[in-house]
């Protein structure tokens, strides 16, 4: 691959960001042409990209040809499918004949990791059948702040060891079903009082406190073979000494995630359209800072 193609492979975008309305619902010729200029590594589908079950399946099946014809590797075809009431783009769309699973908080409250494995197998099973190969799940956040506005029932709970056990078995189940899991949101979004979708989200945990709690599920996910970790736009000033989001921090990514936790897989940034980033950086600057980190 050329240098331009190799750089392009670092990006995952929404389909319509490549060719506008022509690529929102279909892996069209316009999308194929756009890949010649923007050879991205994959796409993530949201509700606006899902009109019918057949349309989604066709898009995902035909995407491979678009990428192959552009001379770049087959794409990551991703979706946010955590399960439960809040973040399950496929199951909650009403378009697909798939079973819905409970919130992860309910699964965690059972204390039975086998239930988490069943959820992972169920979600990844139907995603693979539809044509997805990446799921931005499981949520590895430890819910230590009961007033957290964004994680809540998406987390397995407040016990880091239990959350870690649930995350680890879910990772293994998803891999066995043929879908790549992505543990999120490092270094942990469960302690914040803010929602990073709308603005800055801050944890005041020290490095020692994070290591004893928030990092535990990520360590277990990594030990279970998780190939991807999503870094959130969470400020950790007691660790970094500044207000830089973790997604743009070399200390958090290279120093902690790669160094202390020994992660050698793919590091994914949360969306650069979220308030925690765009209120301080434009998307282009944020992307460069993330790659540098």
Task: Give the residues covered by each predicted segment.
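Enzymes and membrane/adaptor proteins characterized by extended Gly/Ser/Thr/Asp/Glu-rich
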Residues: 16, 33-163, 185, 190-204, ...
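Short helix-capping segments at alpha-helix termini
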Residues: 66-73, 176-178, 225, 259-264
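Phosphate/pyrophosphate-binding betaalpha-module
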Residues: 166-187, 193-196, 206-228
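Short beta-strand/loop segments at the ligand-binding rim of alpha/beta enzyme cores
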Residues: 4, 11, 76, 178-181, ...
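Structural motif corresponding to alpha-helix initiation and N-cap regions
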Residues: 25-29, 215, 283-284
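Structured alpha-helical segments in the cores of large, soluble enzyme domains
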Residues: 30-36, 135, 174, 215-224, ...
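Boundary/entry segment of secreted carbohydrate-active catalytic domains
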Residues: 1-25, 270
